């Protein structure tokens, strides 16, 4: 369930093992997504099923295509890079220290991956949204008191274009990404074990590319004709808590990455040539569930309203819910939307003013 990076690579691995995967993707194919992304800028409205996070390729398809990680929990990076090259990515990524495909090149690569899945006997269904999991003991999981320990044997899904419901039988991989909050709500209401994890929370910094080039290359003239747009990496500890740069996009854009109405959150991306006049990077602090417990408790009435709007049972909420990090995200994103005049226009200020907790009079 989901055709982002997790779903794509899981499908390709299953094909290697002799299986024919069925991929269910709530969003549209990678080309059709472009129209909905354009509408975010034109109309300031976000399609809850097709946006910068939902659709073929997931959140990464139109947000850069950087292919490196600082995580210690990883498998064969070389194998992943080779799969990208087999599907049309530039072979430079096999040698680059920080491999990067680029937002303008990645959609074609993803399309080729989908075609491989289909040619090998798999199926890919777009605008097909999971409704519920099917359990071995009860058949259909509909009640929040379903017995724990049941084996999942399939999913029920709805075609968003036609309204038709379909049943798909077999083992299930949930590759729905971090933004499919309706999936987490469903899992919690069905009493399927989920666990809160820490997240990184922060802001996105934007600077003139030439400024970063001058600093990083120690040259007032910048990078010249032959050097790439400069990157930077920042890591430190503040009061025992990690603070670090994230998703640095030299010569790129800041983009709206909300997945529904009344939300505002941003991401960054770069085209393959990294040639724009601006560079940007996330600057985040690690945040743990215990950090937000009091905040969530203080906003319980707001959360209950959100739950009712999501057609969930608000009584399921407790201050120590496994969903508390998700609730925290939703509240902060709504507050940012309100500060952005209830549009997809991100509020901004100078970084020096932000860290000193004062208003900016200009940018």
Where are the language model's segments positioned?
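Residues forming the flavin
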Residues: 1-363
